[in-house]
């Protein structure tokens, strides 16, 4: 497994930042070739073209939206495969009149040996930083 972290600061309230970052269907607009659905307990990101692709199935293990302008919001998703396993943690907190998002993720692409952990982390940082910035732009 490989872990990566992303931190972004924005001039949005913690509540608005949380709303944008946890709007699961919008993640599909930010990640190429992906459609995301969710029912509040499970989030599924289907990535692919036509019949070729895979589903990243995630269970919402922790859901604590920020309460008020000074609250901290936390969400933990557990990826249960079959192709992608691991977890993602999202934290939103007040920061300099706006808010900061910390996205931490540990993942494993099932078919890849550990030799690919570093390139996977690099790709994860690039893809998720781009996705996070897109989500925060609204």
Label the model's feature ranges:
Residues 1-40:
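Hydrophobic ligand-binding cavity/cleft-lining segments
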Residues 29-38, 49-100, 106-109, 137:
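Hydrophobic-ligand binding "helix-grip"
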Residues 43-45:
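Ser/Thr-rich, low-complexity intrinsically disordered terminal regions
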Residues 106-138:
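A conserved amphipathic terminal alpha-helix motif
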């Amino acid at each position: 497994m490989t872990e990566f972290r992303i931190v972004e600061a924005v001039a949005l309230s913690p509540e608005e930042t949380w709303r944008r970052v946890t709007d699961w269907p919008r993640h599909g607009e930010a990640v190429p070739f992906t459609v995301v659905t969710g029912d509040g307990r499970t989030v599924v990101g289907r990535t692919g073209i036509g019949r070729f692709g895979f589903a990243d199935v995630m269970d919402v293990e922790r859901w604590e939206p920020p309460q008020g302008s000074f609250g901290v919001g936390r969400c933990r998703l557990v990826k249960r495969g079959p192709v992608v396993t691991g977890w993602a943690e999202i934290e939103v907190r007040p920061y300099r009149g706006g808010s900061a998002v910390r996205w931490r993720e540990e993942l494993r692409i099932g078919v890849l040996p550990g030799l690919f952990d570093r390139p996977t982390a690099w790709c994860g940082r690039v893809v998720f930083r781009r996705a996070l910035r897109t989500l925060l732009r609204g």
